Each structure stands twice: as C-alpha cells, then as structure tokens.
Amino acid sequence: MSLKLDGKKLSLEIEERLRNYILTNKTIAKRNPGLAVIRIGEDPASGVYVGNKEKACSRVGIKSYIFHLKDTVEQKEVEQLLNKLNLDNNIDGMLLQLPISKKFDEQRLISFINPEKDVDGLNEQNIGKLVKNEQAMRSCTPAGIVNLLKSQNIKIEGKKIVVIGRSLLVGKPLSLMMLNLNATVTITHSKTINLNKICKEADILIAAAGKPNLINSSFVKEGAVIIDVGIHRLTSSDKSKTRLCGDVLLEDVIPKVFAYTPVPGGVGPMTVTMLLVNTIFSWQKQFGLSSTLNDLLP
C-alpha cells in the first residue's frame, strides 16, 4: 500500500510546537511575532489564501496585519507601504499576496521588502543566498515539501529528482534546495521534449506545472515518490458540482508509487506552516531568542 504524505497532520503537529515556542519566549521578546500581508485587488482565491494565513497565525499566536488595497492603488503607494512596514518593529514578516495585476512591477515590489522580513523568500538577496547555500529565508512551498519528505525519512541525498515547473515560487527555489541537499535534479517545463520519459526516471517526481491531472501512471516509475503541488477547482459537465484536484491523476498513480501527497491536504497546509516558521525565525533573530526553532521541524 502506498504511503500518504499527510501534510495536514504534520502541519498541525508543527503548529503545536510553534505555539509552545512562542508562549515560552514571548516574555523575553515582550510581544508576539507579527506578520503583515499585503493583498491588492479582489481576486477570490487570494482572499481565501489570505484568510487561511490569518487563521493559522491566530492558532499559533502570531499577530497578523492585513492590508487590503484596491486595484486602483498606484505602484508608488504600495512601495511606500512596504517601506513603512520595513521600519515597523512590530512586524517580523511581510509578504505580498500573489498574483497581482500586471499593471504593477511585481519584482520591484518584492525587492522593496527587507530580506530579513521576506517570509516568502522571493527577494533577490534571499534567492542569491539560496544559490550559495547560505542561511536565509526559504520559499514556503519548497521548504514545506522538504520537511514533508524528511518527516517520513524519505532520503533526498543521491536521489534523482525531477521537478515539473520553473516558477520563482516553487520550481526554481525547490530545485536549488534539492541540489543543496545533494540530490541530482532535473527541471522540466512546458517546452521540455519527451517529458514522459524524463519523469519516468525520477525517484522523486514533483509536479508544479499548473495543469490539472497532467501526470498519470505512464509518467511514474514503480516505487517512486510523487509530490503534487498543483491545486485546481474543476466543475462537473452539468456545472452542478465542483471538486479539487492537483496536477497528478492520483487514482491512476497511487497503485504504482511508494508515497504520494494528496490534494487537498498535502503540500498546501505545509506551505502555510512554513510561512509561520519563517515569521517566527525572523522574530527569534530580532530578539536573540533560543535557537531551538530548527528542532521543532522534522
């Protein structure tokens, strides 16, 4: 029977440890950690994601500050807000909820975030440190995947890992993290020739393509580990029902693989949990708190 990598269960376990860590250390810091989230526009999915982050913060004792701006806001106004938050000592972590309208220079806005507060790990300084394998904020989804694998003692070193997708949020930072952990990494994308053949060589296959049910059993070798980063809401043909699915046709691949992540309840919860970890990491550094935070992770 295939092993389900239960991200929801692991995230709740880590959250409990984080909550206790904050309770133990907030008397020294004299305040709880603070996370600022900037949301621009009315994208419904962004609203759900921001709400999930706010609830997770509340569960562990992080104070969340939500800044919901209208689409009519100007680039300069967002930059001014980011600069203000950089200087706010009550804010340990900051993130710009993506995606945002194409009228904004997204990368310029991210570059305005203090690297020490960049809990999404997208600032060029943090990406550069990741390339050099130096300590820095790590992108949340890739870090969540690494910890999910570690929690089940799934070996990364020496393994052939194929990543489908090259986004700045997942594919690129994840590939670098795996390389830093001594895996042999292949990055594939929409222009890759013979994708099926390349994927079938993977000991660990990570699907972050953004295409529902792209990966079936013909892409997967016997005994592989498959990580599904995708999440999509599909509507039935009569439009009466919707259901969530990932990039992987799970019912087709499960009989063939050693381990897999479900959708929902796999990578998603771990992404939010690593956001909490990054925020607390910044808080810990600011106040010189006990460095046992890493001991709370797998």
UniProtKB/Swiss-Prot annotation:
The keyword Calcium does not apply. SUPFAM superfamilies: Aminoacid dehydrogenase-like, N-terminal domain, NAD(P)-binding Rossmann-fold domains. Keywords: Amino-acid biosynthesis, Histidine biosynthesis, Hydrolase, Methionine biosynthesis, Multifunctional enzyme, NADP, One-carbon metabolism, Oxidoreductase, Purine biosynthesis. It catalyses: (6R)-5,10-methylene-5,6,7,8-tetrahydrofolate + NADP(+) = (6R)-5,10-methenyltetrahydrofolate + NADPH; (6R)-5,10-methenyltetrahydrofolate + H2O = (6R)-10-formyltetrahydrofolate + H(+). GO terms for biological process: L-histidine biosynthetic process; methionine biosynthetic process; purine nucleotide biosynthetic process; tetrahydrofolate interconversion. One of its GO terms (cellular component) is cytosol. Pathway: One-carbon metabolism; tetrahydrofolate interconversion. GO terms for molecular function: methenyltetrahydrofolate cyclohydrolase activity; methylenetetrahydrofolate dehydrogenase (NADP+) activity. It holds the Pfam family THF_DHG_CYH_C. NADP(+) binds at residues 165-167, 190, 231. It comes from the Bacteria. Its EC number is 1.5.1.5, 3.5.4.9. Homodimer. Catalyzes the oxidation of 5,10-methylenetetrahydrofolate to 5,10-methenyltetrahydrofolate and then the hydrolysis of 5,10-methenyltetrahydrofolate to 10-formyltetrahydrofolate. Belongs to the tetrahydrofolate dehydrogenase/cyclohydrolase family. This is Bifunctional protein FolD.
